[in-house]
Amino acid sequence: MVSIITFTKNVLVTLAFALLAQGLAIPEDIDKRAEKVVSLDFTVTRKPFNATAHGQHHQSQQQQQQQQQQPAQKRGTVQTSLINEGPSYAATITVGSNKQQQTVIVDTGSSDLWVVDSAAVCQVTYPGQSPTFCKQDGTYKPSSSTTSQNLGKAFSIRYEDGSSSQGTVYKDTVGLGGASITNQQFADVTTTSVDQGILGIGFTGDESSPTYDNVPVTLKKQGIINKNAYSLYLNSASASSGTIIFGGVDNAKYTGSLTALPITSSNELRVQLSTINIAGTTVSASTTPVLDSGTTLTYFSQTIADKLAAAVGAKWNSYYQLYTSSCNLAGNIVFNFAKGVTISVPLSEFVLQDGNSCYFGVSRDSATILGDNFLRRAYAVYDLDGNTISLAQVKYTTSSSISTL
């Protein structure tokens, strides 16, 4: 594959010189398109952690789940719910013939792309919240795009954190990372309690409406990438940016070897976990967590979460719905997967500070999720065509060595 890419680059260099000699313009992104990859940078946004708001929010979530009959799509993506609890990973895309800019959460835990309508109603849920909070990261006005198609279908999605969005299904041109895909289906949301739009890139089987080609599938079908696969590099907790590469992998961003683990679900990006080493204790954790870029914290069943918390001396607080912990957790927590794959994470990644108090970044939930506090220390390649997720220990570097998948 490398030799093919090198040959292609040489041909393109020759072509570029030929075009310049004739006074013609060189097409934008000619090199990127030749390598069949789309590199999309994250913008990292941080908000102070608020334990009181977390507790009130999750208690409200539990009440809503008891009252509502509609099944949730997934556990709420904390960054896209009403309370951001850590770094939020979003990317800028454009929608429409006039390239209306949107900044959307990149979410491996859901599968739908939806954006906020220019006339949307933002559902205010707590005192002091701006009535336009959902429009601050860009909006979409269908009538201003000559390529917009209203499909006349209703869209509704609800997350387990109680947040929800409703609107109408459209097709239009979507631009991301220098690539442009035409007739992409997505939702134009007119009512939402979520902070901003979401770019869901999971399996199509997890979509909120009858199966359609979501963004990664369309990228492949329109020949922009070779396969429905992408690699995720969130970068360090203090970094201002990260990258997702559709159709490619950055071999400079990990140490050791990438090992492919079978995806254990037909509609969610889950892999087999076996044990967790923490503070000299080995905790049995035979479960299949979702590797979810749209969730800040890590979640396990109460049995597993209690054992992890006990190992670091953290105590459950029912009001905050979190474990209170020391602000100075030392050492590492090591996640042991199938095939001998291990990912080591400093326990400092699992400390949430609110004033002088600190909380453990693992909490209880019926859904098992490895969120951003895990993913920042892993380099992950999601191969949805091959039904695998490959993992390796991350390497923080500005160097890059991208190859196609």
Curated annotation (Swiss-Prot):
Induction: Expressed in greater amounts in the mature biofilms compared to early biofilms during inflammatory disorder of the palatal mucosa among denture wearers. It catalyses: Preferential cleavage at the carboxyl of hydrophobic amino acids, but fails to cleave 15-Leu-|-Tyr-16, 16-Tyr-|-Leu-17 and 24-Phe-|-Phe-25 of insulin B chain. Activates trypsinogen, and degrades keratin. Residues 58-70 have a biased composition (Low complexity). The active site is at D107, D292. CDD domains: SAP_like. Residues 24-75 form a propeptide. InterPro entries: Aspartic_peptidase_A1, Aspartic_peptidase_AS, PEPTIDASE_A1, Peptidase_aspartic_dom_sf, SAP-like. Pfam families: Asp (PF00026). GO terms for biological process: fungal-type cell wall organization; proteolysis. Residues 1-23 form the signal peptide. Gene3D superfamilies: Acid Proteases. The keyword Transferase does not apply. Its EC number is 3.4.23.24. It is found in: Secreted. Keywords: Aspartyl protease, Cleavage on pair of basic residues, Disulfide bond, Hydrolase, Protease, Secreted, Signal, Virulence, Zymogen. Pepstatin A binds at D107, T108, G109, E160, D161, D292, S293, G294, T295, T296. Disulfide bonds join C122-C134, C327-C358. Residues 52-78 are annotated as: Disordered. GO terms for cellular component: extracellular region; extracellular vesicle; fungal-type cell wall. One of its GO terms (molecular function) is aspartic-type endopeptidase activity. Optimum pH is 2.5 using casein-resorufin as substrate, and 6.0-7.0, the pH of the saliva, for cleavage of Hst 5. Monomer. Belongs to the peptidase A1 family. Secreted aspartic peptidases (SAPs) are a group of ten acidic hydrolases considered as key virulence factors. These enzymes supply the fungus with nutrient amino acids as well as are able to degrade the selected host's proteins involved in the immune defense. Moreover, acts toward human hemoglobin though limited proteolysis to generate a variety of antimicrobial hemocidins, enabling to compete with the other microorganisms of the same physiological niche using the microbicidal peptides generated from the host protein. This is Secreted aspartic protease 8. It comes from Candida albicans (strain SC5314 / ATCC MYA-2876) (Yeast). The gene is SAP8.
